[in-house]
Amino acid sequence: MTSQEKTEEYPFADIFDEDETERNFLLSKPVCFVVFGKPGVGKTTLARYITQAWKCIRVEALPILEEQIAAETESGVMLQSMLISGQSIPDELVIKLMLEKLNSPEVCHFGYIITEIPSLSQDAMTTLQQIELIKNLNLKPDVIINIKCPDYDLCQRISGQRQHNNTGYIYSRDQWDPEVIENHRKKKKEAQKDGKGEEEEEEEEQEEEEAFIAEMQMVAEILHHLVQRPEDYLENVENIVKLYKETILQTLEEVMAEHNPQYLIELNGNKPAEELFMIVMDRLKYLNLKRAAILTKLQGAEEEINDTMENDELFRTLASYKLIAPRYRWQRSKWGRTCPVNLKDGNIYSGLPDYSVSFLGKIYCLSSEEALKPFLLNPRPYLLPPMPGPPCKVFILGPQYSGKTTLCNMLAENYKGKVVDYAQLVQPRFDKARETLVENTIAEATAAAIKVVKEKLLRELQARKQAETALREFQRQYEKMEFGVFPMEATHSSIDEEGYIQGSQRDRGSSLVDTEEAKTKSENVLHDQAAKVDKDDGKETGETFTFKRHSQDASQDVKLYSDTAPTEDLIEEVTADHPEVVTMIEETIKMSQDINFEQPYEKHAEILQEVLGEVMEENKDRFPGAPKYGGWIVDNCPIVKELWMALIKKGIIPDLVIYLSDTENNGKCLFNRIYLQKKSEIDSKILERLLEELQKKKKEEEEARKATEEELRLEEENRRLLELMKVKAKEAEETDNEDEEEIEGDELEVHEEPEASHDTRGSWLPEEFEASEVPETEPEAVSEPIEETTVETEIPKGSKEGLEIEKLSETVVLPEFPEDSYPDVPEMEPFKEKIGSFIILWKQLEATISEAYIKILNLEIADRTPQELLQKVVETMEKPFQYTAWELTGEDYEEETEDYQTEAEVDEELEEEEEEEGEDKMKERKRHLGDTKHFCPVVLKENFILQPGNTEEAAKYREKIYYFSSAEAKEKFLEHPEDYVAHEEPLKAPPLRICLVGPQGSGKTMCGRQLAEKLNIFHIQFEEVLQEKLLLKTEKKVGPEFEEDSENEQAAKQELEELAIQANVKVEEENTKKQLPEVQLTEEEEVIKSSLMENEPLPPEILEVILSEWWLKEPIRSTGFILDGFPRYPEEAQFLGDRGFFPDAAVFIQVDDQDIFDRLLPAQIEKWKLKQKKKLERKKLIKDMKAKIRVDTIAKRRAELILERDKKRRENVVRDDEEISEEELEEDNDDIENILEDEFPKDEEEMSGEEDEEQETDAIERLRGELGEKFEADTHNLQIIQDELERYLIPIISINGARRNHIVQYTLNMKLKPLVENRASIFEKCHPIPAPLAQKMLTFTYKYISSFGYWDPVKLSEGETIKPVENAENPIYPVIHRQYIYFLSSKETKEKFMKNPIKYIRQPKPKPTVPIRIIIVGPPKSGKTTVAKKITSEYGLKHLSIGGALRYVLNNHPETELALMLNWHLHKGMTAPDELAIQALELSLMESVCNTAGVVIDGYPVTKHQMNLLEARSIIPMVIFELSVPSKEIFKRLLLEKENEQRLPYPLHNSAQIVAVNNVKYRKNIGEIRQYYQEQHQNWYVIDGFHSKWWVWNEVIKNVQMVNKYMQTYLERIKAGKAACIDKLCITPQELLSRLGEFEQFCPVSLAESQELFDCSATDSLEFAAEFRGHYYKMSSQEKLNKFLENPELYVPPLAPHPLPSADMIPKRLTLSELKSRFPKCAELQGYCPVTYKDGNQRYEALVPGSINYALEYHNRIYICENKEKLQKFLRSPLKYWEQKLPHKLPPLREPILLTSLPLPGYLEQGIATSLIKAMNAAGCLKPKFPFLSIRRSALLYIALHLKAFNPKGSEYTRKKYKKKMEQFMESCELITYLGAKMTRKYKEPQFRAIDFDHKLKTFLSLRNIDPING
């Protein structure tokens, strides 16, 4: 539990959410490289290798130019033309193209590698400008690779290059020079000779000989084709290298110095490019840099997939293409089949299989080649959030009042879109366009009419002119011929002309009137037309009218008008108001009312397209990353089929059409809304109708009443008439029949008259009709005239009618209906018809929309709030862009089987595991389970219970398998899977719930209680809980073992009470407790009691109530429990599984029957004994009471008998008068006794009862039998329970309960430990994979490398600070956890991690590391090499000695200048100079291992010169260990080594003389080296090498770990921009001074908090020093350092409260010489201590003179302090003490007194008092007595020696001398004590004396007459 709490302190080192991980990767910067090096060193070749592996973009001039030319871009065409024309390409253009490439999308995704910047050409840009260009790139370079190569080696290599004149391929010297090839062959041959047999050697030699011959033949063939390029000439190469060093090198060195040293990779240019590439890859792997994610096309040209394939089948097919590994298929993305490129634009297009790619382990389907190209270049913009998301192109349709506008607004707010109201934005524009069309049509018609009228008038004018000409001609002829007859034709023509003229004049006159009328008429028509256009803009007309022909005629007749222009001047002006024009356009104006577009719906679609374009342009920035198209919701769109067809044709296709409907309860909800909206209108109509009906009813009632009254009146009259007739009949019985008929006629007339008068219908019926029956239809047929007549008659009575209406309205009430319904009245029928017609139109339109593959969402509005509708719409819109879950099908199982078989073929170990586990179990173990592992996620979320899922009910979500408890749970998951999975953190596991069961007496209660206390959870005893439920009422426990005792006790008590009553005895209370009254138990309590009594299982209803409190209710639900003794029966276990109350495990405590007997039988026997004792006591009491009762009864009976006898006697005496003799009396007494014996016999039961009592042996046997039977029953029951629990997949834990209690408890804790400690990871599952597969996954970015990189997270959590290195000896073990790969260093750590991954990823991320550089020095045979090798094997560091470095250069680079110089020295028999050795060491340090893991330098440096060379080359070790071993131990080890060494054919360099020389040389030089490193770098550690190698190893590792931890912490904090401690970082004092901050060596924390100037320059230690923002600061203590590290900004400018004073304002301590040099300046305060005076509140007593040893200068004043403490106070707070004034009265001056002038006591007191006291005290303690001297003289001598030995003013030599003499004096004094103890009175032979007795006796005797001081 504690470990779990501890892990929660830290956040996850890696992002837990998979989507967030992907987003983080997409936002990350790609790794960018820059390669520096001399020209020709191999930058381009290395860049080519890196590009192939790292997939970054190589930005070089030549590939870019070739790419531009091949793509035939504008720049490419220009470049090609320049090259064809023989021109050179300007540098400016090349740089421009390179910059374009560096800023391209491709580079933004993959990163770049630059090799040609800076270039040697300075024409376009200088070197500094080129460097600034690199620094100012959007993507800054992360890694700088510097290839180093000596000038000589580089020039030789380049000058040896040759180029093939045909192919252009360049050959190096070792490829074309036969001599070089031969030399390489010989060296290789010599190297391979060692360690091989003769046969193998011969075979290899033959093969190599053949290969060599073939190679030489090839060389001979190409040799005559090789030429040397001019730039490869030696002098040209030298010039280029020289130019590089002069112009570029210095700038590059500055750049590299500024760059993070971790990301600076320096390479040895003499190595081949392949080896350099491997070194770079190792360094990148060490730095944990992520390579660019590559995209893989999932379908080749030869593979074809049908485009119409179902999505599921398509994804299964694509997931198997180019498989990473079995079980690791390409996953489905959120986009599904949607094209991400088009979706980014706002269009939802399905992708095609031919354009499918994989990226980040997921499948993406692109829709076209055009979409695929940009996605392949840079997929990041298309995948970053908010993508994928719906573009929000929605149409919402529905009847009026269905809530579509509300839903539109809410949806627009949700997606930051805009609502396009069709009625407000589209329809007005269409109406306006139609008005414009009508106006244009009328204008065209008017222009055509004007043209026609003008033509007509022109023709008339021409005719008139012709007539006038003819008339003039006639007049001329008439004048010539005075007499003649006119021709008839002329006459007729003239007459006709005149008539025509007159007619035309008449027509013109009438036309004026018509013009005015037409004008007014046309105005009215236009006005009406405009109104009608507004009115009928929604109608569709069958005919369309155009006037194109008129416009064409008008354009064709322009010439005619121009020809007749002079004539037109004579014609009146024709305008639109011309009567003839008005007459002509009247028809057009009438027809314009029905004018519309030829395709009106296309016009609607065009306008809607314009509106949507404007909306999208205005709202394009509605949220970051919003798609270009979309963001609109169309409301109130007409549901016209033709309109939708036009919209689809125009491409206005929504992503979703939402139809709001109300089909439930016949549209009750919608009609309710309509009614509430139009309530007043509908209610008024209802009231009006009800009033009419009521009035009609009132009228009908009134008419019926009148008719009834009339009938009654007629009946009364008839009755009277009949009575009258009877009277008359009586009077005139003799009247004739005629008279009777007349009377009858009169009666009939009387009847007819009232009927006729009463009838007011205005129609009289014939007599025949009166007698016949009236048909039912008649009143209806004549009802109208009746109403009319009544109305006419009632019109004059208005006031009376008004009163009646008011009364009626008071009685009319609206019909009642439910609140959520509407009144079903005729007034609602129009609305119903309207909605019905809308539904019919929608049904027609729905088919059209579906045919266009537009998604339709039918939403029921009944019983749903707008928020619920919005949520449903949002879910529908976003569901296509979410991960989908699907039920596990046969195809999934087939894939799993296929993967398993493939793995079995690859993995041989799997076969071994199969032998132990079955195939099904292996498949189950290897399955990739989901976020709840094998538990049901639905039950976990809803009930917080760990219920194992059923493998038959399985589903897959995001390529992970989930198991479910039931089909219903699976359906819930499939509907909303995202609600049941983990997101930002793992799902919270329920607390521990354990069922603890076992036979009675197994110890489960004790174990459960101890476990619960330890885990801090509840301990629940099931049967005790049941007892507690009854205990309140029963006040006693219930059960067979309790009930039997209580019944016996109750019967005994009852018997005892009865006997006590009989005996009239009061029984004691403890034996006569009252019986409890009977209690009334509830039904539930009765069931519980029955269960306890009869040992039966509880019914499910009771169990549900009890168990739900523990599983589902707080606080137990969130705390956990140990459930003791449950389940008791199989039925209860079955209830657990059926109801879903699953524990984490069921613990079965197993014991034997003998264990039960041993535990329970003693207690049972004691209980039996106690019962027997009570029983005997009770029996004795009963017996006594019965005896007492018997005695009392006998006494009563005896008294009765005696009374009877006496009575009889008295009677006999009276009768016989005789005295009774004594014999008779005795006989009578005997008779009485006999009677009593007969009546009260002795109780035989009591006599036999004692014999029937159970004996102890019998009781033991009985109890043993009962326990055995109970144990067997319990065991059988538990076995069934165990089988039942296993059936429900509940884990079973078996514990042997027969052992001791603490052992059982320990075993139980260990078994439950995984459930407790690994609780946080209970749902996590890890998958180990091979290392090659891990690298492949990282290459394809199928999985991500974790934040730990190649650190072992387990070892990191255990405090390891040295990164493990992968090699053959130390393999790594990759493990996949979620989307990350973790690398573990051993199998043990792998197992730990897999059990609890959450624990190890909840820790701080690993700190940045640097390669460890260790130097180990020491004398020969001190163990340097042993320790170095141990470090190398343990941590993978390189073991390097100076000899090894030299051999490395000579063997691997023999042609280099360094190797040649070394060979020159060695061949002459000289040692290699230190300068060359250090160069070889530097080359060796450039190895990959040295720059990743680190290096251990063994035994170097050993001289000061070597140390200086290391410093000059900046080879500074992190730590130097000196193994200190005495010389004696060295030679001892040498001898042991020689004894054990093997004999070799050559002498070893390990003779004693050589070792002695080396030892002396080492000890001579090591002191100076040690002092230098201790002072400069403080990295020197001395290890006592005299200890064992394990002790030395532990000390070394402890110090390495400490220093490495300091280094890592420093790098981590500096990288985060925080302050960091700089201790243990090898910082020199010079560097410290150069980088001191604003406060120099004063503590900034003290200055800020207390304004104290704490000078830290007194110590050279950097323990309290820190770095912040590139400056160093020193603090005064650890507390101050911690404060500075926590908030450094508060203590440095600009937030620092106090700046450091200027130099003249800082107090300075003065030495005695500096104080003397200030003469004649006097001290302030007359030499009194200012600190003492100020701290003493400036009192007189505080005036203490200062000491000149503690002088200081401040403000150009001198102050003298009393002591060092006061001096420090003044130096820290000068402002407090500097300005003070002395009082007027001062103490007298203290003048010095000569010591010799004092009297002897004073002299001794002031001079040697302290020393003398110490000497006398020592003499008193020792009591010295020198041989042959008195005690006084001995004491004086000792005091004198003591004073000399401890004289503080004496020299060191003098003190040592007298200390030695004092020791000799004390030894002589001790001789007396020794001899006194050992010498006896009797003589002893020498052999019986002590060994040293004679020697000490001689010494004693020799001291006679000898000076004890001088000898």
Curated annotation (Swiss-Prot):
<feature type="binding site">
    <location>
        <position position="1447"/>
    </location>
    <ligand>
        <name>AMP 3</name>
    </ligand>
</feature>
<dbReference type="GO" id="GO:0004127">
    <property type="term" value="F:(d)CMP kinase activity"/>
</dbReference>
<dbReference type="InterPro" id="IPR027417">
    <property type="entry name" value="P-loop_NTPase"/>
</dbReference>
<dbReference type="GO" id="GO:0033862">
    <property type="term" value="F:UMP kinase activity"/>
</dbReference>
<feature type="region of interest" description="Disordered">
    <location>
        <begin position="728"/>
        <end position="796"/>
    </location>
</feature>
<feature type="binding site">
    <location>
        <begin position="87"/>
        <end position="89"/>
    </location>
    <ligand>
        <name>AMP 1</name>
    </ligand>
</feature>
<feature type="binding site">
    <location>
        <position position="229"/>
    </location>
    <ligand>
        <name>AMP 1</name>
    </ligand>
</feature>
<feature type="compositionally biased region" description="Acidic residues">
    <location>
        <begin position="733"/>
        <end position="750"/>
    </location>
</feature>
<feature type="binding site">
    <location>
        <begin position="1050"/>
        <end position="1052"/>
    </location>
    <ligand>
        <name>AMP 2</name>
    </ligand>
</feature>
<feature type="binding site">
    <location>
        <begin position="1421"/>
        <end position="1426"/>
    </location>
    <ligand>
        <name>ATP 3</name>
    </ligand>
</feature>
<dbReference type="GO" id="GO:0050145">
    <property type="term" value="F:nucleoside monophosphate kinase activity"/>
</dbReference>
<keyword id="KW-0963">Cytoplasm</keyword>
<feature type="region of interest" description="NMP 3">
    <location>
        <begin position="1441"/>
        <end position="1472"/>
    </location>
</feature>
<feature type="compositionally biased region" description="Acidic residues">
    <location>
        <begin position="892"/>
        <end position="919"/>
    </location>
</feature>
<dbReference type="GO" id="GO:0005634">
    <property type="term" value="C:nucleus"/>
</dbReference>
<feature type="coiled-coil region">
    <location>
        <begin position="676"/>
        <end position="711"/>
    </location>
</feature>
<dbReference type="GO" id="GO:0031965">
    <property type="term" value="C:nuclear membrane"/>
</dbReference>
<feature type="region of interest" description="Adenylate kinase 1">
    <location>
        <begin position="31"/>
        <end position="285"/>
    </location>
</feature>
<feature type="region of interest" description="Adenylate kinase 3">
    <location>
        <begin position="1412"/>
        <end position="1601"/>
    </location>
</feature>
<keyword id="KW-0067">ATP-binding</keyword>
<keyword id="KW-0282">Flagellum</keyword>
<keyword id="KW-0546">Nucleotide metabolism</keyword>
<comment type="similarity">
    <text>Belongs to the adenylate kinase family.</text>
</comment>
<feature type="region of interest" description="Disordered">
    <location>
        <begin position="892"/>
        <end position="926"/>
    </location>
</feature>
<dbReference type="GO" id="GO:0036431">
    <property type="term" value="F:dCMP kinase activity"/>
</dbReference>
<dbReference type="GO" id="GO:0016887">
    <property type="term" value="F:ATP hydrolysis activity"/>
</dbReference>
<protein>
    <recommendedName>
        <fullName>Adenylate kinase 9</fullName>
        <ecNumber>2.7.4.4</ecNumber>
        <ecNumber>2.7.4.6</ecNumber>
    </recommendedName>
</protein>
<feature type="region of interest" description="Disordered">
    <location>
        <begin position="185"/>
        <end position="210"/>
    </location>
</feature>
<dbReference type="InterPro" id="IPR003593">
    <property type="entry name" value="AAA+_ATPase"/>
</dbReference>
<keyword id="KW-0539">Nucleus</keyword>
<keyword id="KW-0966">Cell projection</keyword>
<feature type="region of interest" description="NMP 2">
    <location>
        <begin position="1021"/>
        <end position="1052"/>
    </location>
</feature>
<feature type="region of interest" description="Adenylate kinase 2">
    <location>
        <begin position="992"/>
        <end position="1203"/>
    </location>
</feature>
<feature type="binding site">
    <location>
        <position position="1506"/>
    </location>
    <ligand>
        <name>AMP 3</name>
    </ligand>
</feature>
<dbReference type="GO" id="GO:0046705">
    <property type="term" value="P:CDP biosynthetic process"/>
</dbReference>
<feature type="coiled-coil region">
    <location>
        <begin position="443"/>
        <end position="485"/>
    </location>
</feature>
<feature type="compositionally biased region" description="Acidic residues">
    <location>
        <begin position="767"/>
        <end position="791"/>
    </location>
</feature>
<feature type="binding site">
    <location>
        <begin position="116"/>
        <end position="119"/>
    </location>
    <ligand>
        <name>AMP 1</name>
    </ligand>
</feature>
<keyword id="KW-0547">Nucleotide-binding</keyword>
<dbReference type="GO" id="GO:0005654">
    <property type="term" value="C:nucleoplasm"/>
</dbReference>
<dbReference type="GO" id="GO:0015630">
    <property type="term" value="C:microtubule cytoskeleton"/>
</dbReference>
<feature type="binding site">
    <location>
        <begin position="1001"/>
        <end position="1006"/>
    </location>
    <ligand>
        <name>ATP 2</name>
    </ligand>
</feature>
